[in-house]
Amino acid sequence: MATLGNPQNTIEILKKYDFMFQKRFGQNFLIDTHVLEKIIKSAEITKEDLVLEIGPGIGTMTQYLCENAREVIAVEIDKNLIPILEKDTLAQYDNVTVINEDILKLDLNALVQERNGGKRIKVVANLPYYITTPIIMGLFESHVPLKNITVMVQKEVADRMQAGPGSKDYGALSLAVHYYATPYIAANVPQNCFMPRPNVGSAVIRLTLHEEPPVKVKDESFLFALIRASFNQRRKTLVNGLTNAAELALSKEEVQTALEEMGLSATVRGEALTLEQFAELSNLLAK
């Protein structure tokens, strides 16, 4: 039975092991059972699932995952948390493996092949806010076989992931997320649901992976280089933004001609284009 998820039990475990929070790991442990249940429900965990948990901490959410999933692999970077997980909070579960590693250095494709025969898995995480984007983009770009990713992130980041063209939150992250997945904000989470309290509000967002991207492009890496260049200097026109990006090696004439072919103004900005329009522009400009 899950025993964590409230302040009292969390404090007891931390005191028992003299655990000190490491600021460099961005540690904020969940202490609200309603939020934990909401995450499990949003992730649609079943007894068929292998779940990868990134940053289990003291095992608060891991206990819930173990009770709902077939198997859980929990990857934790902080070696001081491993004894708590293995000897205490997860000792009662036989369907969990704890790996002391940096998720960004782990070969997840090999791990999924070995543990799940290459079949699609689910990812659940209460992510350190300073490293949210590299972790999510790493999962997308390495093409790990995934059904969905359900993560606790900074509210502002969740809004950016879900944003559409023309909004202030719309940018390169929004487009990358929509290329790979369908985002859904399942819950907003206040600061008092964590220990220690973060300085900002949080949100649970589920990213349901597309079986195939919604747009077809000649060169995926060129598409994302184009998108990044379009938002590097938000207030510049697309023509100026793209011709200033050395990695693209595009002339003003090339960009203007492509935009004209698409029926777009030479003064249009990146924030006005949909994913479909970026894909079309990428295909016109890819060499």
What are the language-model segments listed below?
Residues 1-225, 229, 260, 271, ...:
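Catalytic cores of RNA-modifying enzymes
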Residues 209, 228-287:
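C-terminal lobe and adjacent flexible extensions of AdoMet/dcAdoMet transferase-like proteins
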